[in-house]
């Protein structure tokens, strides 16, 4: 019957009812203090408490594999995956991406999923969060695999790939043994690279560390993060990159009241107060960034209550039909002239809104070009 999925709120009861011997912590993007607080609770209740090895849990592929991970959610993994994909395409390699799991429905049906077209996304009833990760790959002409059974997923991907890209989620460690491991570090959140689990592991085991978004970060914070990278992983190559932010129709934003919609996880467990959409609105000369909180309904209102750091920015939550409906209602009720969409997808495909939408894109740019391509060539 598989492993039962139970609420962590009931952990003490489950331990005592079943006389549990061991508890393994196996989710990501939480402060170190959270993990140890949980450990102290568990060992006080009786069982051993453990965290999983990064390397012993990796599946080996028969094809060259490049893993892209991060120290926190919302650093720029997906844009880096696209950047590396384009390098491989230029080298004449057939690329297949495997995305970190985001299963919310029938897990048996989602064991091994393959996405090549938008119709595939519809057929698998993908959430907004899944679409945010899959659509950019499809737009670039790449097949994406995801699901639950990551042994069978990689074996299917190997049948059609010269090179496999692991597109990591949250700040989790790779599920596959990489030939090249790239980790993104965020100067907008200096110190988080040493204080979040398991992101610090990625920092310490990577071959290439990318300090991203240096074009929008304070110089002293960039230097702090660079120093932490070199101290934690002295054998890694460390480079700086820009995240180049572009609005497709900046004229819709200039002088207008803008409602900024950002990638949900970046604003929620990622802990950010802004994202690419906020920068795009500022760059385009928005007269005002409208606070959506007073107009939020249902699940969106609950998200603001749980994550007050989101501030005036609207997180694009869409894990189910009700959240999508609440997102649409919140956008339509907010008195703005334009929606600045900082998510990686086109919301117009998902919801119907009563305002024009300016879509924002963000792409990786090496400050000193050439290092990433050189390291990619070395493993393929």
Language model segments and positions:
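Short, conserved acidic/polar surface loops in the N-terminal third of protein domains
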Residues: 34-38, 60-63, 108-109
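Phosphate-bearing ligand-interacting subdomains
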Residues: 1-55, 324, 335-346
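"Short basic amphipathic alpha-helical interaction patches in structured regions
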Residues: 37-39, 81-84
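Repeat-unit-sized solenoid/scaffold elements
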Residues: 34-55, 168-169, 357-375
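Flexible phosphate-sensing "switch/lid" loops adjacent to ATP/NTP-binding sites
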Residues: 9-18, 66-69, 79, 86-365, ...
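Conserved glycine(s) of the Walker
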Residues: 75-76
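Flexible, Lys/Arg-rich cytosolic regulatory linkers and terminal tails that connect or flank
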Residues: 46-70
């Amino acid at each position: 019957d598989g492993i039962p999925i139970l609420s962590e709120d009931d952990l003490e009861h489950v331990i005592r009812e079943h006389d549990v011997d061991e508890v393994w912590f196996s989710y990501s993007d939480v402060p170190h203090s959270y993990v140890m607080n949980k450990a102290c609770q568990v060992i006080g209740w009786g069982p051993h408490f453990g965290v999983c090895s990064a390397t012993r849990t990796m599946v080996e592929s028969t094809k060259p594999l490049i893993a892209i991970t991060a120290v926190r959610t919302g650093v720029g993994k997906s844009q880096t995956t696209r950047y590396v994909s384009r390098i491989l395409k230029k080298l004449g390699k057939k690329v297949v991406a495997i995305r970190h799991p985001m299963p919310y429905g029938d897990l048996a049906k989602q064991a091994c999923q393959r996405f090549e077209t938008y119709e595939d996304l519809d057929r698998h009833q993908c959430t907004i969060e899944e679409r945010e990760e899959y659509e950019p790959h499809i737009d670039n002409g790449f097949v994406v695999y995801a699901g639950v059974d990551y042994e069978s997923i990689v074996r299917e991907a190997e049948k059609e790939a010269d090179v496999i890209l692991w597109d990591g989620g949250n700040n989790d460690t790779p599920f596959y043994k990489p030939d090249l491991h790239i980790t993104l570090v965020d100067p907008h959140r200096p110190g988080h690279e040493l204080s979040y689990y398991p992101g610090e592991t990625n920092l310490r085991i990577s071959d290439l560390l990318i300090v991203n978004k240096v074009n929008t970060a304070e110089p002293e914070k960039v230097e702090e993060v660079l120093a932490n990278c070199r101290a934690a992983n002295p054998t890694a190559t460390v480079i700086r990159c820009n995240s180049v932010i572009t609005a497709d129709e900046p004229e819709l934003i200039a002088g207008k009241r803008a409602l900024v919609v950002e990638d949900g996880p970046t604003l929620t467990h990622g802990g950010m107060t802004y994202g690419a959409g906020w920068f795009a609105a500022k760059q385009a000369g928005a007269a005002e960034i409208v606070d959506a909180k007073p107009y939020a309904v249902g699940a969106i209102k609950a998200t603001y209550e749980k994550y007050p750091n989101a501030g005036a920015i609207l997180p694009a939550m869409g894990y189910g039909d009700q959240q999508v409906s609440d997102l649409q209602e919140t956008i339509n009720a907010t008195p703005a002239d334009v929606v600045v969409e900082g998510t990686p997808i086109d919301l117009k495909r998902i919801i119907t809104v009563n305002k024009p939408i300016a879509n924002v894109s963000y792409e990786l740019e090496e400050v000193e070009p050439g290092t990433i391509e050189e390291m990619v060539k070395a493993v393929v």
